[in-house]
């Protein structure tokens, strides 16, 4: 089923959204033709997402799941006559759920880089950056200003991977690098002064700055750049 979904997601996105969501399995004409033959075999697309990850996946004022990636998944499912099943998941349980086939894919601002050996990915559909957000009145304007400060990020996130990898030297200057289960709590702690900075995706930073105008600012230099793709079980 996974391979069929990968193939079908590719051509559905190209057709209805002009987003190149290629499968990574193959993009040949032969596979394009075979996707027409297999679409009837798939009835439900089960998408795992983090429901506290705006603007990609979150709960609206009516407690209904919404967000850019969920809208994209819904359009793909609609164009192919599939039922879409959205499963809010604990982010640190995503691998177990994927390997147990409780979900078909992870579609929620999911970074490819550094995870290529762990998942089968579609081709990337978005360029993203990891950034640092601080309070506007913090006086922190660059990476040097983070020395001896407490920085928080989401557990098992791309930002954490960067701070433990390519930017480990920078993280070594922090007083502490903390992790939380979601970014909503991270920004609540930043607003309350419990932490000094949040490391997160660019789009999350922009969302929080827009929703809390004047409260936060983003350091000019990014931690890293990366690509988003849909992740499937390896193999």
For each feature predicted by the language model, list its residue ranges:
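Flexible hinge/capping segments at coil-to-helix
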Residues: 134-151
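C-terminal motif of bacterial Sec signal peptides marking the signal peptidase cleavage site
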Residues: 20-24
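Extracytoplasmic small-molecule ligand-binding "clamshell" domains
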Residues: 35-109
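A structural signal for short loop-to-beta-strand junctions that line the ligand-binding cleft
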Residues: 45, 68-69, 116-125, 216-221, ...
């Amino acid at each position: 089923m996974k391979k069929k979904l990968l193939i079908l997601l590719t051509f559905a996105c190209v057709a209805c959204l002009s987003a190149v969501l290629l499968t990574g399995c193959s993009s040949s004409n032969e596979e394009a033709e075979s996707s027409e033959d297999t679409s009837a075999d798939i009835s439900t697309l089960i998408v795992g997402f983090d429901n506290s990850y705006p603007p990609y996946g979150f709960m609206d004022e009516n407690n209904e799941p919404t967000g850019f990636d969920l809208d994209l998944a819904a359009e793909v499912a609609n164009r192919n006559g599939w039922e879409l099943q959205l499963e809010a998941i604990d982010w640190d349980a995503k691998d177990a759920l994927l390997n147990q086939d409780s979900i078909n894919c992870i579609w929620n601002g999911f970074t490819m880089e550094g995870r290529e050996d762990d998942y089968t990915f579609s081709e990337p559909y978005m360029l993203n950056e990891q950034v640092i957000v601080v309070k506007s009145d913090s006086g922190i304007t660059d990476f040097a200003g983070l020395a001896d400060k407490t920085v928080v990020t989401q557990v098992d996130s791309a930002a954490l991977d960067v701070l433990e990898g390519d930017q480990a030297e920078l993280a070594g200057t922090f007083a502490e690098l903390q992790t939380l289960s979601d970014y909503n709590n991270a920004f609540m702690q930043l607003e309350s002064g419990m932490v000094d900075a949040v490391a997160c995706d660019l789009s999350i930073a922009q969302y929080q700055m827009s929703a809390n105008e004047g409260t936060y600012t983003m350091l000019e230099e990014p931690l890293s750049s990366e690509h988003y793709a849909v992740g499937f079980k390896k193999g």
